Swiss-Prot record:
PANTHER family from the UniProt entry: DNA MISMATCH REPAIR PROTEIN MSH1, MITOCHONDRIAL, DNA MISMATCH REPAIR PROTEIN MUTS FAMILY MEMBER
GO biological process: mismatch repair
Superkingdom: Bacteria
UniProt name for this protein: DNA mismatch repair protein MutS
This protein's record includes keyword DNA damage: yes
Keywords: ATP-binding, DNA damage, DNA repair, DNA-binding, Nucleotide-binding
HAMAP family: MutS
Keyword Metal-binding attributed: no
Pfam families: MutS_I, MutS_II, MutS_III, MutS_IV, MutS_V
GO cellular component: cytosol
GO MF, any single term: ATP-dependent DNA damage sensor activity
Organism: Clostridium tetani (strain Massachusetts / E88)
NCBIfam families per record: mutS1, PRK05399.1
Amino acid sequence: MKLTPMMQQYLEVKEKCKDCILFFRLGDFYEMFFEDAETASKELELVLTGRDCGLSKRAPMCGIPYHSASNYINRLVSKGYKIAICEQLEDPSAAKGIVKRDIVKIVTPGTYSDSNFLNETKNNYIMSLYIEDKSVAMCFCDISTGDFFATSHSLDKSIILDEISKFDPSELLLNKDIDKNILKEIKNRFTISITNLEKDYFKDYNLLEGQFSDFSKEEYSLVLIKCGNGLLKYILETQKMSLGHIDCFKNYNIVDYLSMDINSRRNLEITETIRDKSRKGSLLWVLDKCSTAMGARLIRNWVEQPLINKEKIDKRLNAVEELVLNISLHEDLKDALKDIYDIQRIVGKISSKNVNAKELLSLKNSIEKLPYIKDILSKLEADLFKDMLSNLDELKDIYELLESSIMDNPPITIKDGNLIKNGFNKEIDELRMAKSHGKEWIANLESSEREFTGIKSLKVGYNKVFGYFIEVTKSNISSVPEGRYVRKQTLSNCERYITPELKEMEDKILGAEEKLISLEYEVFVSIRNSIEKDIDRMKISANIVAILDCLSSLSTVALENNYSKPKILEGNDIIIKDGRHPVVEKMIPTGSFVANDTTMDTEDNQMLLITGPNMAGKSTYMRQVALITIMAQIGSFVPAKEASISLCDKIFTRIGASDDLSAGKSTFMVEMWEVSNILKNATSKSLIILDEVGRGTSTFDGLSIAWAVIEYICNNKNLRSKTLFATHYHELIQLENKIKGVKNYSVSVKEMDKDIVFLRKIIEGGADQSYGIEVAKLAGLPEDVIIRAKEILNSIEQNKDNKIELDDIKENKNHIEKENKKEIATDKLLANDDFQISFTQIEEENLIKEISSIDILNLNPMEGFNKLYDLINKAKSIEKK
């Protein structure tokens, strides 16, 4: 048997898009066949039917109306599918043989640009990742706005994960021969649509130079050029058109921004909460009070990429301060901003020929506000505002064109007429007049025929099948004069008639209407094309509006929450007076948050060692220091009475327990990997947050590791990062007298009767107990358990031999010099004879030989910890024997 011609055509088109669901246009429907139909019927909950295709079995089929396709496309794209749109390329009534059809667009998660369904507060990025010769390049594009930027770096898996985490792309393009471990890590950590491409796909095709007038290959590495070319090629192939709004190539350097690895972003809840991935409860939720979608997207970018350039930060802070101090001007600015639509995405639609008349009307109404904004800018003095004033284009010519041409309430579709105002085009006015006169003639005909026949219910109607007709109900048919009308249609309750004069007028009316709709569409396209020439001007003004909106948002937040302007320093100090957690204070009753001071530097206050019970507020305090630092480097006021913040290059956090079972890693192993990453990558300009390091293993192992980490951070002159270290190992408080830079702090607790009250105040000095049983009581453990726990604790405390004293653990002086050469100390830890970590009890020659043979010059921090852990376990095993 042979396939039908239509089905042959379908399979030929399908061959071009094997990885897509093909929407095949047949009349007023998009039809899907075979496997595509089965998939779509399941995902879209459509009825699966069949169609004769020339084979013995009917082809599985389902379909959707073409006019409602957007909703179905969105549902499929959100589930990670790609959709190929195949349209009819000629009028079926004029076609000779089978209608010509072909793919006009491929919609993928990363190239989806329908603003009706996109999150207006977040960019929809597609990302390409290209690795070659121990270098990696990453390129990002948001088709809806035209943003296109890239970076390159020496190959580092953590850098790749950090950038994916930062920009959260919907789709990732990568070369098929990418390292399997990197690919596995990406799949484990992110929900992202991945498209594998042959390495040749990324070859240098000179596409970037063709797309971006300011791009020069000589300025960039080959790996970056290939990465960018691959992304641009994919975009052009899927969109099937030139995209003029993608006209600016930006190369960014990762080290130009405050770096936060994937764990830090998660732990600090920068854009979403850990618990339920909600925006509410994140730092972004606090800072985003933007009036426009453009501002909301930009402030998200600011939050994801805090600055490390003092001049740029101070410019933002000075602008925010001026708005805070000029409340009247600030309110005027907010009033103007709230009426501005998403100019960036409207411009994207203009470029891709998808804009409708309502969106052009929104563009006009937005442009109308630009003179007001320019007037406000002229009254402001901050350098950032002066820069904006000189660059803001009021776009008056575009406003005048749209004001004179587009109807005030046009339809959504652009092929149904009623788009163009009277007076803009003479021919349109004449056709409207003809159409109007024709309909007036119809109305007069209805009136005269009622009078002539005496049938008061007689009416002149219209439908697309029969055109105009005279309708008479069954009860009045006897009153119709003989020979006056020609019967056209009989219905159950009426008869429909025509006359030669009515048909003649119908031709005139419909002819005028058809010409009018066609001409209005032509004029609309002409207006759109005229505006498209000024895309650059519109993008510049839109970007200025977005920046203004961000500054306005930060000013609003500062005023609403009683924030202060931080002082940005070049040194290493962090000094915060009455600091507060920006998120927590908004989630509890106003005024109930307990503020705390912070003093940190790289000398006497480098390592703040914080002890105290669970639930007392240690983690909140440490996070607030990190968040205040981030806010300051964004250019935001901060939740504190005063704050002086030295520029920070990186923020690291190691907070909470997290298994990575899919990778076969335990909680403790994950913890050690994270600590290792911190020690390898932190610098003297970094801020480190460490919460309960070492708790994932036995007490003495954990204590040993925590102690070694503190020594390493404080004694390594190439590190010496400012660090907040929370611990339950109270023995560590004695390190304040042993290691320069360690400073003890604790969370104050008040004992009342037999209960405790957390005062949430950070005070100098270490805590001497954890109040663990009291916390357990607060958590609701049974009374019997609490009583028994106290009995056991009393018994343990009475046995003094079971209490470890850190003074008994001799600090090894020799390793400090070695650590300044990036080594890990694995020298013997000497302790009380009653404990398992006592190396003096180890007499077996083979273990001694193993220890003496360790080449510490070639151990990194992680290997050092692992080796120490292994030696301790062997020592325990020998002791048991």
